[in-house]
């Protein structure tokens, strides 16, 4: 009976882990990655479209991203969209493709990025703890309604804590990996 509460809780917690991964993908490290441009929207005949829908993105060198528009007249709107996205990148074009050179990050900027990442990590941990609290409240309500016994409640609470601990360990692992990547010179 209580397994459904734990299954639902686990699904919500896993979503929180995935959200953190996605947020970290958008963080600029010393290495070029096309995921930096995931949120860039280009005005394509009046419709906001993602960059990958109007151009081919590639990483030919560790600090360079190239964007090859499928239509040459899209170079201007793509450059404008990149500048408006405030990524700290200046596009340069040769008429056929746009080149983004990522300058190396300063030590100070790296520390700022890590500080922001730690805040994101903490926000996700708070979300996980809130999910845990809701699950425990649901379990206590089930016990109060006599849907589960007191022994089942204790067993379920232990299981909830075990799942929560493993999810928080996952969040810490993701942070440690990304922090290492950012601090790498």
Curated annotation (Swiss-Prot):
InterPro entries: Ribosome_recyc_fac (IPR002661), Ribosome_recyc_fac_dom (IPR023584), RRF_sf (IPR036191). Keywords: Cytoplasm, Protein biosynthesis. It is found in: Cytoplasm. GO terms for cellular component: cytosol. One of its GO terms (molecular function) is ribosomal large subunit binding. Its main location: cytoplasm. GO terms for biological process: cytoplasmic translational termination. PANTHER family: MITOCHONDRIAL RIBOSOME RECYCLING FACTOR PSEUDO 1, RIBOSOME RECYCLING FACTOR. NCBIfam families: frr (TIGR00496). Belongs to the RRF family. Responsible for the release of ribosomes from messenger RNA at the termination of protein biosynthesis. May increase the efficiency of translation by recycling ribosomes from one round of translation to another. This is Ribosome-recycling factor. It comes from Trichlorobacter lovleyi (strain ATCC BAA-1151 / DSM 17278 / SZ).
């Amino acid at each position: 009976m209580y397994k459904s509460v734990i299954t639902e809780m686990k699904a919500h917690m896993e979503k929180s882990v995935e959200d953190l991964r996605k947020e970290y993908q958008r963080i600029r490290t010393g290495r070029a990655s096309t995921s930096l441009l995931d949120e860039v929207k280009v005005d394509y005949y009046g419709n906001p479209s993602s960059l990958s829908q109007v151009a081919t993105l590639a990483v030919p060198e560790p600090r360079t991203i190239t964007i090859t528009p499928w239509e040459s007249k899209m170079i201007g709107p793509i450059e404008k969209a990149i500048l408006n996205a405030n990524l700290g990148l200046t596009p340069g074009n040769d008429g056929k493709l746009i080149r983004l050179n990522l300058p190396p990050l300063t030590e100070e900027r790296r520390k700022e990025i890590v500080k922001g990442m730690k805040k994101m990590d903490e926000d996700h941990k708070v979300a996980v703890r809130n999910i845990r609290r809701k699950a425990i409240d649901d379990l206590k309500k089930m016990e109060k309604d006599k849907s589960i016994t007191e022994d089942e409640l204790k067993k379920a609470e232990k299981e909830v804590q075990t799942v929560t601990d493993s999810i928080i360990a996952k969040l810490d692992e993701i942070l440690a990996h990304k922090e290492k990547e950012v601090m790498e010179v």
